A protein has these predicted regions:
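Core structural elements
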Residues: 80-83, 212, 327-328
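Nucleotide-binding motor/catalytic cores of P-loop/tubulin-like NTPases across gene-expression machines
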Residues: 317, 324-329
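Nucleotide/phosphate-binding catalytic cleft detector across ATP-hydrolyzing
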Residues: 1-16, 20-207, 224-226, 235, ...
Length: 329
């Protein structure tokens, strides 16, 4: 792989693994050349449970991209998601070096150094440190403190933490394929950066990504990621509920996508649909209203967890743009 030209991203989910390859144009901007999605196995709610299955899943997607573009992938950026990813805030301060001439970059860097010295618990690693605000002399809140007058500079940082075990397992799967991880990022943050507009990030929005095994939530306000969380429940839970209607697993997803509704009162009361059974001649009739009732029940569960996470963020009343939904489920 030509390192200077290609950028590779691998997103391992509970139901699919996606590999995206971009190439830098003459001005250095990334242009997507290929996106491949393959079913994944060996992942439950974001946690790798079977290294052999995961390696094979990633290999299938990587090889497809490689054949399509005529390259061999040896390094990639990766995303990670699960309830083992969380955020925590920490506040610290420094005294400015030259109060008469205002806060300078050296003061800001000194504050960053203090934040870089903050240690994670033994079983976690810090993925990112994101400044939330700056406070000069405890009463002047500013987005950029350089030039402000004061003796004391404080800030609250949002630390993005991840348990070490899932990181180690994902890196192991990549190493088995001869792929070096260039960096690992929380999917909730990546989704927010990719999906939300500049206005949504500035005025406040929560992006909710409903995946197969998990639902990621990220809250943005004043162009800063304020909070992230992962709910260990996604479209897979809805699919499992639909199976209780007597539907074979291989028909569940297509039934949901073609006839499903998350609002039962909008589904026709008496309309039925026939679903294939275990043999070519066997069918099962399902009331669309009953299908919608099952979907709505689980969708409400997910929505309630999302609402609680937004409340826990402390920014629920500041989201002018509300909630932005995304995901392939």
């Amino acid at each position: 792989m030509e390192k200077k030209n290609y950028i590779v991203a691998i997103d391992l989910g509970s139901s699919n693994v996606v590999v995206a390859v971009a190439e830098r144009d003459a001005e250095g901007r990334p242009v997507v050349r290929s996106i491949v999605s393959k079913p994944s196995q060996g992942v439950k709610a974001g946690m790798i449970t079977n290294i052999e299955q995961v390696s094979n899943s990633i290999k299938a997607a990587v090889e497809t991209v490689g054949e399509e573009l005529g390259i061999r992938i040896t390094e990639a950026y990766t995303g990670i998601s699960g309830d083992f990813v969380r955020c925590a805030r920490h506040t610290d301060h420094v005294f400015t070096s030259d109060p008469q001439n205002g806060v300078n970059r050296t003061d800001v860097e000194a504050l960053f150094d203090r934040m870089r010295n903050v240690q994670a618990p033994d079983d976690e690693t810090i993925m990112e440190r994101i400044p939330q605000n700056y406070l000069v002399d405890e009463n002047q809140e500013v987005a950029d403190p350089v030039g402000s007058f004061g003796k004391r500079l404080a800030s609250t940082f949002n630390f993005i933490l991840c348990a070490k075990t899932p990181i180690e397992r994902l890196n192991l799967a990549l190493r088995r394929l001869g792929i070096r991880s260039l960096g690992m990022y929380a999917n909730a943050l990546v989704t927010g950066a990719a999906v939300l507009s500049a206005d949504e990030k500035e005025e406040g929005a929560a992006v909710v990504n409903i995946g197969g095994g998990v639902t990621d939530v990220a809250v943005y306000y004043r162009n800063v990621p304020r909070y992230i969380a992962t709910i260990p429940m996604g479209a897979g839970a809805i699919n499992n509920d639909i199976r209780t209607l007597g539907i074979l697993e291989r028909h569940v997803d297509s039934l949901k996508r073609k006839f499903g509704s998350a609002v039962a009162e909008l589904a026709p009361e008496n309309k039925m649909v026939s679903v294939k059974g275990r043999t070519a001649k066997e069918t099962k009739d399902i009331l669309l209203h009953n299908l919608a009732v099952v979907i709505e029940s689980r969708a409400r569960d997910i929505a309630e967890y999302v609402a609680q996470e937004i409340r826990d963020s402390g920014f629920g009343d500041k989201l002018a743009y509300g909630i932005v939904l995304t995901g392939g489920s």
